[in-house]
Amino acid sequence: EHELSKFLSRLLKYKLVVGSTVLILMSDHGFGPFHKFIHVNNWLRQHGWLRLKQELKPRLKSAIFDMGFTPMGVYNLLMSFGLGYLKREVVRGRGQGLLKTLFLSFDDVDWSQTTAYSLGNVGQINLNVRGREPQGIVNPGPDYEKIRQDIIDRLQELRDPETGEHVIQEIYRREEIYWGDRLEQAADILFVPTRMEYFGFGEYEFGSNQILERMKRGISGTHRMNGTLVMHGTPVKPGVEVEDACLYDLAPTILHLMGEPIPSDMDGQVLTEALTAEYADPSQVRYVDSDKTAKERSVTQELSAEDESTLTERLRSLGYVA
């Protein structure tokens, strides 16, 4: 924050933002305190929506898991010796095979008896849908909707036993959030934890044997839904607080300020309330029909094996790919 303030001061002091140039400072999320992880797969297992295999090896792994031999237990031990950095090397690096050998994982799940599972962090639940998942058992239609509603109802009841407060603040069906031809790739249920002070654990399928787990060491804060937007320049109306701006309002606003037309299928809107009368005039906001053919071609164009490998490694180094 201090370095950012110094940078902005230099920009303004030396009048580097001149004429019609606009400085836009934005963050794609805010930040705040973090209290506990939610281990969603444990919660699903507790309610019978996720079941484990009954063969000897999964049963042994399950038994020692329930006794406390978990990835988070090992991580806390490493942290006590100052070796917490090794977690990134294992979880986000190339140690997934070792994790699956030592600890409970999706390899130990009985998919023929499992109706729901969780992947990713924050709050996402997928149903094990027939014809969509490799071993899906939930029939699309009424069966799917009933199970989804049952899970939503139970999520609304989840409370923190230490405080008694509800852990989940908002719950959505995927079609209430997403749209388009990639909707099938979204999780079936999405939820926002209370004040984002709880957080769905997403670095491993079964990170702990608890449902709610206080972080003993390591991170103390995490993301918030609301970010920051600051605009400065001649086209910007001073002293205005913009209400209900979204991330996807930035692109059409920037195109408009550059004097460029906005593609007709682009999400978001020009933030005219932040602009002076000259730039806020609706008649000056231009739109252009999107080139569907070029768009489809760019979406379907396949990467070479080398490019895909390079992209994957870059994403892995940032922690987005395991």
Please report, for each region that a protein language model flagged, where it lies by residue:
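Secreted, luminal/periplasmic, and some membrane-associated catalytic domains
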Residues: 6-22, 26-204, 252
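A conserved hydrophobic secondary-structure block that centers on an alpha-helix together
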Residues: 1-5
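Low-complexity, glycine/alanine/valine/leucine- and proline-rich hydrophobic stretches
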Residues: 194-251, 257
